[in-house]
């Protein structure tokens, strides 16, 4: 995670990468990153860095851009995958309407939520806004089942 402080300091995307270095849905991630950069008023360079990464196991690759640091490509293994997790819910952080929903540089609320979840003996903090599950501290909630199961 970035140490930048404001939402307009950085734009990023995180994608699944397999053991062959192939990025899942690479073009879609780059399109979303361009859209988010525009919403955040971050001017991206014309060319993107190579998304080819050398990995020995399936994991995540994070592509980020900041004016101060330029492009960065980071790989990390999955910390949890296909297993049952315990969660707490916390109020979702809010910014201005253009910033809400963007992958940006203000990580403080996410870090604080992760620490809060760990102190409660949980694996993840789920962000709720107006009675809806909108995000999580370290992954994107994909589905909320009727029985309360959240798929991240």
Task: Annotate the PLM regions.
Residues 1-132:
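Conserved alpha/beta cores of soluble small-molecule-handling proteins
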Residues 132-152:
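Glycine- and Gly-Pro-enriched alpha-helical subdomains that act as flexible
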